[in-house]
């Protein structure tokens, strides 16, 4: 059976990996936000919607994102970060408030990636550049952005590629270490995430 065991060394390694991943994604999201604007960034307003603050990775992410935005010239007081509390209606209301406040760019980690079309329509109607992070809208939605030449982008990982990498890591370990009960098979536990969001 393949299982994860806890130890302080592994926990520290995991935390370091999460922090590095959060830093990398925050950097990519900031670059996308900066590319969407021109001129002096110090007076630009940034609205950020996070699906849920209690998610540890997203806590690291939003901290790194804010820090990186400031390092690129945005003022901290012009960056507002909202907690969607894992409720799409709450997040939609926050997005509408950001539109009313006339933010210069909106960064959204959607509660439900299936809501992307509705979110995109609202934000594009207001003429605000939009950056989706971490939870990828479907391919049809991304194709629609290209066809309409909208100022919308997605920054995140390719879930299929991540699965391929995980499989390669397991294969590299080798059967002699993975076949713990000697039956010629690799036993494993599959942990599923949110079916609404494949990332």
What are these regions (language model features)?
Residues 3-199:
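A residue-level marker of the well-folded mature domains of exported/periplasmic proteins
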